[in-house]
Amino acid sequence: MEADALSPVGLGLLLLPFLVTLLAALCVRCRELPVSYDSTSTESLYPRSILIKPPQITVPRTPAVSYPLVTSFPPLRQPDLLPIPRSPQPLGGSHRMPSSQQNSDDANSVASYENQEPACKNVDADEDEDDYPNGYLVVLPDSSPAAVPVVSSAPVPSNPDLGDSAFSVESCEDYVNVPESEESAEASLDGSREYVNVSPEQQPVTRAELASVNSQEVEDEGEEEGVDGEEAPDYENLQELN
């Protein structure tokens, strides 16, 4: 009868104090040993016989390099530089440079004395415009004949003396062969027989007279060559006319 009277509720009430004391003991134990619990847990996970070593990382060592000693000197003072005159520039479209960069450019710049190519090109263009104002060349038509000086060719005689005398009479009226006389000898430079200006007092020698005189000289020269066997000079002044 007593065994039937014990129910699950009674059994629970009997076991309740035992469970409470067990939980209290566990809580106190946990509070007192937190570090030891962690160490024991890690040891339980990894047995002592097996040791895991971390991988060793080898870093290559660079050899020690000896650098030379560097001695610092105070900066040298630059000599005073004179400002270089520059051409004025328009203010409207001018591009301002920083002051530091402009000073460095002034210090390093050197005056150049070279001819500018664009200026030469402009001069050539101005000359072309002056020569051809409209830009076109003036071409003459084929119908208009070109003005070419016509030189009349005189017949060349067989005798060189006659040719020279005729040429002097026809082309050059100022200089003619003058027969030998005292006036011509005095008018020449050193008394030699040369071409001299004809004075207005002397009468001009006609062609017929010159031709006759030259033919006589040629005949005389031929006779002298037959007798003496020597060559006479190619050119001689005319003899005095009577």
UniProtKB/Swiss-Prot annotation:
Cysteine disulfide partners in this protein: none
Lipid moiety (S-palmitoyl cysteine) attached at 27, 30
Q: Kindly state which keywords UniProt assigns to this record, in alphabetical order.
A: Adaptive immunity, Cell membrane, Immunity, Lipoprotein, Mast cell degranulation, Membrane, Palmitate, Phosphoprotein, Signal-anchor, Transmembrane, Transmembrane helix, Ubl conjugation
One example of the protein's molecular function in GO is:
protein kinase binding
List Phosphotyrosine occurrences by residue.
Answer: 175, 235
- Provide the positions where the record notes the PTM Phosphoserine: 41, 44, 87, 104, 109, 112, 199, 212, 215
Question: What tissue specificity does the UniProt entry give?
Answer: Expressed in T-cells and mast cells.
Extract one GO cellular component term from the record: immunological synapse
Cell compartments where the protein resides: Cell membrane
Family matches, as InterPro entries: Linker_for_activat_Tcells_prot
Query: Looking at the record, which segments are called Interaction with GRB2, GRAP2 and PIK3R1?
Result: 175-178, 195-198
**Short name of one Pfam family for this protein?**
LAT
- Annotated signal sequence is none
What are the transmembrane regions? 5-28
UniProt modified residues of type Phosphothreonine: 40
User: Does the record bear Transmembrane helix in its keywords?
Assistant: yes
Feature: compositional bias, Polar residues: 97-115
Q: Where is this region: Interaction with PLCG1?
A: 136-139
- Which membrane topology term applies here? Single-pass type III membrane protein
Per the UniProt topology annotation, the Cytoplasmic ranges are 29-242
**Regions of this protein lying in the Extracellular compartment:** 1-4
What else the UniProt entry mentions is: Engagement of killer inhibitory receptors (KIR) disrupts the interaction of PLCG1 with LAT and blocks target cell-induced activation of PLC, maybe by inducing the dephosphorylation of LAT.
Q: What does this protein do?
A: Required for TCR (T-cell antigen receptor)- and pre-TCR-mediated signaling, both in mature T-cells and during their development. Involved in FCGR3 (low affinity immunoglobulin gamma Fc region receptor III)-mediated signaling in natural killer cells and FCER1 (high affinity immunoglobulin epsilon receptor)-mediated signaling in mast cells.
Q: Which PANTHER family match?
A: LINKER FOR ACTIVATION OF T-CELLS FAMILY MEMBER 1 (PTHR15586:SF0)
**Its quaternary structure?**
When phosphorylated, interacts directly with the PIK3R1 subunit of phosphoinositide 3-kinase and the SH2 domains of GRB2, GRAP, GRAP2, PLCG1 and PLCG2. Interacts indirectly with CBL, SOS, VAV, and LCP2. Interacts with SHB and SKAP2. Interacts with FCGR1A. Interacts with CLNK. Interacts with GRB2, PLCG1 and THEMIS upon TCR activation in thymocytes. Interacts with THEMIS2.
> What is this protein called in UniProt?
Linker for activation of T-cells family member 1
Q: Which organism is it from?
A: Mus musculus (Mouse)
**Chain's gene name:** Lat
